[in-house]
């Protein structure tokens, strides 16, 4: 029973990342610069938790893509980083300020290796590499790549690194016209885990895209981000709103 609870808890911590955090073979259509404001859900933008910014740097054959989260006061909260070498996924890292938690994924040929640390404990593992590995900094490129299929109502499947389990978890994207965030001019894309057992414990995340520009404009759901509430660390449910250009 304890093993099942641990696995359920681990899946719960990876559903968002985004926030959720894509190892797409081509990265020629990188995200436009944006600023995301991360609010505690249910406060009508009354409680600002984090500021999100994206960055992309290119040097010789190496491309680095980042999502950086800071507190409203400017303190580092979390960073996701994807590195490509010769347009091929090389590594993915996540560093969290609270909880002394970090993750790293490296590609080694047709395998990926995982490293996960929390406090004084660490875990390592390997899995087979696939072309549809999804991570936060390139998620929006992946949605654009599959845009026609999603708008036509198809489910699009991909693999998301579940670092604490040292495995790749299967997720899907699907148009969600019944979402409370659906309205004229946007398409809501639901992201959910494929496994039926875990789906009973995990709430899906709604990604809101502008139909004309294909830009992501909102995200609503459980966050991988951590905040300290009293003596406890929690993963809040959030509303993220994006603005473009800096």
Model-derived regions, located:
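Solvent-exposed helix/loop surface patches that form functional interfaces
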Residues: 115-186
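Acidic, serine/threonine-rich low-complexity disordered tracts
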Residues: 31-64, 68-86, 92-99, 104-109, ...
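Bacterial Sec-dependent signal peptides at the C-terminal "C-region" and cleavage site
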Residues: 21-32
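Bacterial N-terminal signal peptides that target proteins for export
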Residues: 2-14
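Intrinsically disordered, low-complexity segments
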Residues: 7, 24-26, 227
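Bacterial N-terminal signal peptides
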Residues: 13-23
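Residue-level marker of positions within ordered structural domains that often coincide
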Residues: 24, 87, 148, 219
């Amino acid at each position: 029973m304890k093993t099942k609870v641990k696995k359920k808890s681990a899946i719960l911590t990876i559903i968002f990342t985004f926030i959720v955090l894509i190892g797409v073979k081509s990265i020629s259509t990188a995200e436009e610069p944006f600023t995301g404001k991360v609010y505690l859900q249910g406060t009508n933008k009354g409680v600002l938790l984090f500021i999100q910014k994206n960055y992309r740097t290119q040097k010789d054959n190496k491309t680095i893509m980042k999502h950086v989260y800071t507190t409203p006061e400017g303190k580092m909260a979390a960073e996701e980083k994807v590195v490509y070498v010769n347009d091929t996924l090389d590594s993915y890292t996540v560093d969290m300020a609270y909880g002394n938690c970090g993750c790293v994924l490296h590609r080694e040929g047709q395998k990926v290796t995982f490293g996960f640390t929390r406090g004084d404990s660490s875990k390592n593992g390997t899995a087979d590499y696939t072309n549809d590995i999804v991570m936060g900094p390139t998620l929006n490129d992946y949605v654009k790549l599959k845009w026609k299929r999603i708008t036509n109502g198809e489910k699009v499947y991909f693999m998301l690194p579940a670092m604490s389990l040292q495995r790749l978890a299967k997720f899907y994207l699907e148009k969600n016209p019944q979402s409370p965030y659906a309205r004229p001019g946007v398409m809501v894309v639901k992201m959910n885990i494929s496994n039926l057992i875990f789906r009973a414990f995990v709430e899906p995340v709604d990604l809101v895209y502008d139909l004309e520009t294909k830009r992501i404009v909102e995200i609503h759901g459980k966050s991988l981000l951590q905040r300290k509430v009293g003596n406890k660390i929690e993963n809040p449910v959030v509303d993220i709103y994006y603005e473009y250009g800096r």
